[in-house]
């Protein structure tokens, strides 16, 4: 069993999934993961499918050098965005895995929320490309490790209302006036 960077507060109401050494760009996957953090599971799955179909974009906030602007980024209150298809597919597969783990634990999939998602750099893979005049340059890839923890949302119980509405506290002057009126009417 692999280590996770953080543990869930309520282990009985949460499930985990992780993907080590995924051959997908670290920077794109990091930005996609930040976009789905704290989303309900069903919304996150819909969002990733929309990213694959280029209906919604992923906002690029940290690794945004040279990233073009797109109109879809306005809903995230930013200007730069892209549609990292491969990252979205990998994260969608990871969410499906976590959902299967939740189903195995007997959790309700409709109440699950992406509580924690983290993307770490994995060891770079080295290849080579041949250049002019007999030179060789490195041709590196940037894989990543991804871990996700889904937690069942707590039900918010509304405060019970009393049958009788609470009476306003009256000041001493108003109480005195009420007593005087009562005495006069008798």
UniProtKB/Swiss-Prot annotation:
Q: Does the keyword Amino-acid biosynthesis apply?
A: no
Regarding protein family, the annotation reads: Belongs to the universal ribosomal protein uL22 family.
User: Which of UniProt's keywords are assigned here?
Assistant: Ribonucleoprotein, Ribosomal protein
Disulfide bonding pattern of the chain = none
The UniProt annotation puts the region (Disordered) at 157-186
Q: Which Gene3D superfamilies match?
A: Ribosomal protein L22/L17
Q: Name one GO molecular function term.
A: structural constituent of ribosome
Which GO cellular component terms are attached? Answer: cytosolic large ribosomal subunit
Q: Basic and acidic residues: which segments have biased composition?
A: 157-167, 177-186
Q: Name one Pfam family in it.
A: Ribosomal_L22
| Name of the protein this chain belongs to | Large ribosomal subunit protein uL22
Q: List the InterPro entries.
A: Ribosomal_uL22, Ribosomal_uL22_CS, Ribosomal_uL22_euk/arc, Ribosomal_uL22_sf
PROSITE patterns attached to this UniProt entry:
RIBOSOMAL_L22
For whether the record's keyword set contains Ribosomal protein, the answer is yes
Single Gene Ontology BP term?
A: cytoplasmic translation
